[in-house]
């Protein structure tokens, strides 16, 4: 009998970023550094991920998964529960590869949002360098040493997730691929992975998910998207008009509206795809008073 604390995520999902870090789910309860060039098969069977799987098989409630436990204790449906509903808990043949792939494609972004920082947008880096030079700010690096820097900066260069390591065998179980950034639509290399899924004959059973800031359209990918079962586009909109441009600097509201309309017209051009669109707000003290106003605008779209 499956434990009531069981989570199927480590058995069905892999999250990867452009820095060669892997994790068992979208929330990243643990992040494991792997050498560049490590095969997807070796990433999937990494000992640290297997250790977490064994904890769930033994009926444990791993402390690494604190976010889900806290949400459940507060009466909120957690990612663990949603994943169990989506994939079930009778997991077989999991060793052959993931069903769901979550990729943080890049740290490159064309916005410096108030809710973000340097690890997810390269546009913050010049500001971080300014603070370091003017105020001598410091941070702790990955070796535990104090070095010049702050959370607006990254020691890594601009990087993109490599699609070259994925083989047809790695994709044999895939049902969903989610793309986050940075800004995933700025990463043209991820189109290689889409083509590999198509070539593997899996596109017609695979859902694609994107979280986009709406500052660009998907003209480079629409022909690829047209071959997939379902495409989900989440628009990151924390406010409208002047509030949007403040919270998501240097975003342009008129351009944002035009681009959203472009996305919403995709079902007319590709009616065989199951399209899904949703607005997504990052709520903070900066926008909570206008939350309903923004939500109403999104509903009207």
Model-predicted segments: where are they?
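Accessory C-terminal segments flanking Radical SAM cores
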Residues: 1-86
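N-terminal pre-triad scaffold of radical SAM enzymes
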Residues: 6-19, 91-119, 175-178
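Detector for the c-type heme attachment site
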Residues: 69-71, 116-122
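Recognition helices and adjacent regulatory flanks at domain boundaries
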Residues: 73-100, 109-111, 132
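Core AdoMet radical
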Residues: 98-108, 119-161, 172-188, 200-219, ...
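Distinct, well-ordered alpha-helical segments
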Residues: 189-195, 218-225, 290-292
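Catalytic cores of alpha/beta
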Residues: 285-300
